[in-house]
């Protein structure tokens, strides 16, 4: 529902700017498939072939792929190669952020710290990585949503058990291994970027220990235990990375803070599941303004209209998000 929220607010915002909006979605439980959300709705699955069928009929000025989660963003490269104009973050920037080796090289070039990590497609590679990085490790398969298949392993026995249970591990679909930073504080940052300037919408502090998936975590805005110096450092790193990657629209960066040291966990070149909470907590409609940026507006133009308040403003409240589990469905 978080990505549904983003798509709906983007459709409303673009309609206000004079665009006709076309929604492609096959989930009947979402608001974005309501008849009055967009100008036209195609009840189609998000596959390259089905989306191209829609594009051949509609001939759109552009396609937005960064508000619906991981499924549409994986279509960006194929769509652009087929001549479809992509609005917002381009496939090259998406690849830079999502390719583990290239992103690690970027962090190294910018002198930004990250937990030691490795990629493995065989048991031997996983063992070698574990010896090099050290336990405990967070291990997870590639190309999954919602933290599915993620686990913390503490020794060789745990690692063997995980690798044996991880199906379809191939060179194209490897397992990621990251050093698990024990006793660290995890943060989510949602931001807007127009390739020239970055606006940090929120810095969310997780209430649980590091390692809970962002969408399922309890978190708080503004941060309740971090120093102003650390928050300023996180904002500065976010801006540096957003501009270096060439993001246009929304991005999300996950951080870990341990002993006053800041580590980048990953950058998502798209909307995250924390965007609705960030928007409601701060009063800044991130999805709405991201869509306007993707349509060509600049952050300084939005700021001049009074739409983007000062990032360093103080508020007299705390906003807290907690996950509500649908126990009746289990």
Question: Where does each model-flagged region fall?
Answer:
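Periplasmic-binding protein-like
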Residues: 61-67
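A conserved helix-loop-beta module that forms one wall/lid of the active-site cleft
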Residues: 89-150
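Short Gly/Thr/Asp-enriched flexible loops that form oxyanion-binding sites at enzyme active sites
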Residues: 70-83
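Small/polar loops that bind or transfer phosphate-bearing groups
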Residues: 43, 67, 95, 121, ...
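Short, acidic/small-residue loops that bind anionic groups at enzyme active sites
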Residues: 18, 82-94
